[in-house]
């Protein structure tokens, strides 16, 4: 009987010792889809584009990245070619409607990206026009 208890407790200890990061990207998307947009927001009641990708980096990749689009662009690894983008890469756009002049989202696959789009849309998946990309950054090398 003792052997059975020990056998059961070891897997449970392993499960509870896991960190809360490394959430699969698909699960993260499902959890945040249609969250309202709020400039300066950082949670489910409202989030802006840079806080959204900051949260994604932490929850999916276990990496804490800077809070603003400008500091994110400056601190992350450069992806030189649009053809070498991978799911999870951050894509930055110039934006006249953003206070910083930039917008950021997370590349998914098949020319789609996930982002906190603005007050009317919130967090959505959008088709990507690669011509509109300003720069691409990778969270993990």
Which role fits each region the language model picked out?
Residues 4-15:
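Sec-dependent N-terminal signal peptides
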Residues 35-87, 139:
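Catalytic cysteine-centered active-site loop
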Residues 18, 84, 97-100:
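Short glycine/proline-centered loop/turn elements that form peptide/ligand docking sites
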Residues 34-47, 93-134:
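Glycine-rich catalytic cores of cysteine/serine-nucleophile enzymes that process amide/ester linkages
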Residues 17-34, 135-141:
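Non-catalytic ligand/cofactor/substrate-binding and regulatory segments of enzyme domains
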């Amino acid at each position: 009987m003792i052997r059975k208890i020990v056998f059961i407790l070891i897997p449970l200890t392993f499960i509870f010792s896991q960190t809360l990061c490394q959430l699969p990207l698909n699960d993260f998307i499902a959890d945040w889809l249609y969250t309202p947009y709020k400039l300066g927001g950082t949670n489910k009641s409202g989030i802006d584009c840079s806080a959204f990708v900051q949260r994604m980096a932490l929850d999916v990749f276990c990496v804490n990245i800077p809070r603003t689009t400008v500091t994110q662009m400056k601190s992350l690894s450069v992806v030189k070619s649009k053809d070498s983008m991978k799911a999870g890469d951050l894509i930055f756009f110039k934006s006249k409607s953003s206070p910083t002049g930039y917008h950021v989202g997370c590349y998914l696959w098949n020319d789609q990206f996930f982002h906190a789009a603005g007050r009317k849309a919130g967090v959505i998946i959008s088709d990507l026009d690669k011509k509109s990309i300003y720069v691409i950054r990778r969270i993990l090398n």
